[in-house]
C-alpha cells in the first residue's frame, strides 16, 4: 500500500518515533478513512502503524455499523471518530463521537468536550481550553431513531460505491 511504501522508504524509526527523512518531522498519526460503508484494509494499516509507532485514528463516519473481519470499523486504532453531519450514513444534523478503549484518552476527551471544567462545588476553574461539544438531547434522539434502519442506510451507500466503482473502472481509473 502507499502508506507502507511511504513509511518504509521515506522514514526512520528512532526512539519509538517515526521520522520523515525529508523534513525531519515526527509523523504522529495516520487517519485512514472507511468510505461508503466499505472498510479499508485496516488490519494492514494498523500493522504498519504499530511497526512504525504511528498513532492510528480511524475516520469511520462513512462506515458506521460496518464491520471488517467481524469487527466494527473505528475500533482497530487507538481512536475512532464518526461524524453525524447531514451527508453521513446516519445524521443528527451535526456533531459526532469519539470511540476508544483507552481509559486515559476517553477521560481526556470527555474533559475537553465538557468545557474542561475542574470539578468543584462552587469554584469555576478550567484547566485547559475546552469547548462545549455535547450533543443536545433532541439531536441525539434523531440519531438513535435511525439505528433501526442502519442496515438499509449502509446498503444504500454500498450501492452508490458500486456505481462509482463501475464508472471509474470503465474509464481506466482505479477505485480503492
Role assignments for model-derived ranges:
Residues 1-2, 13-44, 54-83, 89:
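Conserved PLP phosphate-binding loop immediately N-terminal to the Schiff-base lysine helix
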Residues 5-8, 13-25, 29-32, 42-44, ...:
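PLP-dependent aminotransferase class I/II
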Residues 75-114, 137-140:
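Active-site PLP attachment segment
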Amino acid at each position: 500500500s502507499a502508506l507502507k511504501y511511504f513509511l518504509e522508504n521515506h522514514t526512520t524509526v528512532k526512539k519509538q518515533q517515526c521520522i520523515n527523512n525529508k523534513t525531519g518531522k515526527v509523523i504522529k498519526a495516520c487517519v485512514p478513512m472507511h468510505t461508503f460503508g466499505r472498510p479499508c484494509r485496516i488490519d494492514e494499516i494498523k500493522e504498519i502503524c504499530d511497526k512504525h509507532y504511528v498513532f492510528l485514528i480511524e475516520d469511520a463516519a462513512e462506515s458506521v455499523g460496518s464491520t471488517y473481519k467481524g469487527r466494527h470499523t473505528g475500533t482497530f486504532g487507538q481512536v475512532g471518530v464518526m461524524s453525524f453531519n447531514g451527508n453521513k450514513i446516519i445524521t443528527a444534523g451535526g456533531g459526532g463521537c469519539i470511540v476508544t478503549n483507552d481509559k486515559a484518552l476517553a477521560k481526556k476527551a470527555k474533559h475537553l468536550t465538557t468545557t474542561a471544567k475542574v470539578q468543584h462545588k462552587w469554584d469555576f476553574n478550567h484547566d485547559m481550553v475546552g469547548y462545549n461539544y455535547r450533543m443536545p438531547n433532541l439531536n441525539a434522539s434523531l440519531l438513535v431513531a435511525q439505528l433501526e434502519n442502519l442496515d438499509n442506510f449502509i446498503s444504500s451507500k454500498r450501492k452508490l460505491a458500486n456505481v462509482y466503482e463501475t464508472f471509474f473502472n470503465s474509464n481506466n481509473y482505479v477505485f480503492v
